[in-house]
């Protein structure tokens, strides 16, 4: 079974942010703190405002259905940038 690229991208972003928060000494690293940091980075780096609650909803959707697809291209581009690429399409070239 082929792995869902949206889930892989989301998981990669979560791992990057989780490591950053732990290195920074954040006392409580959990879904809310990770989603808040991701939302802040997407807003700062990509100019697209997204609520941390929306990201936590995506997280839950992936837990229920590993084939879930993030419906917003701007979020995908922001996650791709957070993962060190220009955007989602650039990230996808390295994923495939």
What positions do the PLM features span?
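A short, Lys/Arg-rich alpha-helix, primarily the initiator
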Residues: 1-41
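Surface-exposed polar/charged interaction patches
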Residues: 16-23, 45, 65, 82
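Intrinsically disordered regulatory regions flanking bHLH/HLH domains
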Residues: 19-26, 48, 55, 88-94
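Short C-terminal boundary/hinge segments that cap the last helix of small helical domains
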Residues: 67-69, 85-96
């Amino acid at each position: 079974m082929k792995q869902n690229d949206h889930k892989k991208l989301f998981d990669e972003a979560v791992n990057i942010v989780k490591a950053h928060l732990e290195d920074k000494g954040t006392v409580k690293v959990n879904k809310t703190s990770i989603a808040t940091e991701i939302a802040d980075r997407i807003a700062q780096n990509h100019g697209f405002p997204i609520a941390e609650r929306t990201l936590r909803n995506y997280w839950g959707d992936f837990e229920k259905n590993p084939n879930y697809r993030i419906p917003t291209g701007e979020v995908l581009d922001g996650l791709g940038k957070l993962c060190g690429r220009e955007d989602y399409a650039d990230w996808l070239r390295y994923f495939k």
